[in-house]
Amino acid sequence: MTNSNLRTENHFDYVKITLASPERVMEWGQRTLPNGQVVGEVTKPETINYRTLKPEMDGLFCEKIFGPSKDWECHCGKYKRVRHRGIVCERCGVEVTESRVRRHRMGFIKLAAPVSHVWYLKGIPSYVAILLDMPLRDVEQIVYFNCYVVLDPGDHKELKYKQLLTEDEWLEIEDEIYAEESEIENEPVVGIGAEALKQLLEDLNLEEVAEQLREEINGSKGQKRAKLIKRLRVIDNFVATSARPEWMVLDVIPVIPPDLRPMVQLDGGRFATSDLNDLYRRVINRNNRLARLQEILAPEIIVRNEKRMLQEAVDALIDNGRRGRTVVGANNRPLKSLSDIIEGKQGRFRQNLLGKRVDYSGRSVIVVGPKLKMHQCGLPKEMAIELFQPFVIHRLIRQNIVNNIKAAKKLIQRADDEVMQVLQEVIDGHPIMLNRAPTLHRLGIQAFEPKLVDGRAIQLHPLVCPAFNADFDGDQMAVHVPLAIEAQTEARMLMLASNNILSPATGEPIVTPSQDMVLGSYYLTALQPGAEQPEFGDRSRTYSSLEDVIHAFEDTRIGLHDWVWVRFNGEVEDNDELDEPIKSETLSDGTRIEQWTYRRDRFDEDGALISRYILTTTGRVVMNHTIIGAVAAA
């Protein structure tokens, strides 16, 4: 017994997007029912019956082609329920199956005349024009029935292959050919529209043309050589993918599944429908009209006009507005074509496939966290409890604080102190990843150790801002939690912010202080013009250590830019321009004092340094003390 819902695994090496042949397009939409009937071609422009509200047969929502609109129920209602699975109703021809097949079953429209694919004709570059080695304007003249093109010059001496002729020119040549005194036996052949374009593309022998181009490239240079290389590259790609150039001219158009272009009933009884249905309807109407005109052998000028209108309808379906007038619906709003659905920021790829929401992630506004270490970020408690919930629940149960998941969730909702303590244990050593869109290089996403903070904003260390190109004027960042041990290890080893000091693009440091930090450092170390320098020994301005200066500043006994004498026995880089001290004095105990502009040294009898006082400002002491502390802690 087999289960039709079982998923089968298909292993493949790669996914390739290439041109589809007309046969392949028909394969997508064509199915043979168990009774031998072949279905798949959409021939009617109708969507649903306005009285029964059921899809019309052979229309754009046909249940025979695309599958039933209700689970396990045929169109006429003869078969209902799952027990009739797989049966094809002999009355309506609908297969009894799930309605979700309407999300992937396709149909097709067989065109009464070939039409050019607007992407390859009007794209940049125009592949049709490159392959035919003709100007795009000339190709457009042929496709849109403005000019004839010579497909075979025959015995006519003035005509050349691929030469363009206007209506009047061709009429003159026709008169010449069919004149009694004409000596032309092998008549020239001309064509117009996408049929002529298809003929030109079919006549191309890609391997021969490629060989000929290679020979020409060897003997040419400059712009001509670049043009030849461009054409050769396109031809080589066609050969490599086994695609034929004439496939750029469509004989069959695929109809996408109906559930991807739905029609829904609104409260007032009116219907809202996808724009694609209107565009498909235009194509089917014009195609059917053209087929009827061809059947009744209508005048060539009428048939040609209908072919041009069919070409424009297919252009609008594939890429509305790419050429000619944009097709508009109600309120003069341009209809969304297949290209509009796929491309752009709101398109299928960027919005729905690449822009999917993922579990264990969140986003919030960023604010500066100056007290954080570089590898840390502030994570709001409210966010952390949600992101790390499975880990918290697991630990609560393991520590016998609760017995089951339901009780754990209730406890978490109350945000008890116990829960916060467990959360702190969970996040300790568990890195999280921060991402700021747009992620233009690999440093746009980095790992940090989370620190629980109050409020609802993520705190970010100011030094990592250049890597993210972030500022604090309302920027938002996304948080992701790596779950597996391997992911956590990778995040810690490779992605931790403190391990990404250099830019991968230039090799230069990307962690550089800027803006507030530079301004703060400047303000801290700036000298106040005209500030009075104290004499050494002034009790209010002489201190025995850096800590004493900081304590005095905190007690507001001295200002940030006041000059102070402070004892400092470390190395000092002195830019004193004097060759000799301002004052040198030997004391009664044999020690010697040297007074310089910004320092005062005391040496013993052997010349060894006993003590050193330096003249500096409070701000510079604070800066120095902070740096020494940071280096010592590292």
UniProtKB/Swiss-Prot annotation:
An individual GO BP term: DNA-templated transcription
The organism of origin for this protein: Parasynechococcus marenigrum (strain WH8102)
Family statement drawn from the similarity comment of this UniProt entry: Belongs to the RNA polymerase beta' chain family. RpoC1 subfamily.
Keywords assigned by UniProt, alphabetized: DNA-directed RNA polymerase, Magnesium, Metal-binding, Nucleotidyltransferase, Transcription, Transferase, Zinc
Cofactor comment: Binds 1 Mg(2+) ion per subunit.
GO cellular-component term (any): DNA-directed RNA polymerase complex
List of residues binding Zn(2+): 74, 76, 89, 92
Pfam families named among the record's database cross-references: RNA_pol_Rpb1_1, RNA_pol_Rpb1_2, RNA_pol_Rpb1_3
Assembly, per entry: In cyanobacteria the RNAP catalytic core is composed of 2 alpha, 1 beta, 1 beta', 1 gamma and 1 omega subunit. When a sigma factor is associated with the core the holoenzyme is formed, which can initiate transcription.
Enzyme class: transferase
Protein name from the UniProt record: DNA-directed RNA polymerase subunit gamma
Cofactor(s), names only, from the UniProt record: Mg(2+); Zn(2+)
Catalytic activity entry: RNA(n) + a ribonucleoside 5'-triphosphate = RNA(n+1) + diphosphate
GO molecular function: DNA binding; DNA-directed RNA polymerase activity; magnesium ion binding; zinc ion binding
Highest taxon, organism lineage: Bacteria
Free-text function comment from the UniProt entry: DNA-dependent RNA polymerase catalyzes the transcription of DNA into RNA using the four ribonucleoside triphosphates as substrates.
InterPro entries for this protein: DNA-dir_RpoC1_gamma, DNA-dir_RpoC_beta_prime, RNA_pol_asu, RNA_pol_N, RNA_pol_Rpb1_1, RNA_pol_Rpb1_3, RNA_pol_Rpb1_3_sf, RNA_pol_Rpb1_clamp_domain
EC number: 2.7.7.6
Lineage of producing organism: Bacteria, Bacillati, Cyanobacteriota, Cyanophyceae, Synechococcales
UniProt: Mg(2+) binding residues: 471, 473, 475
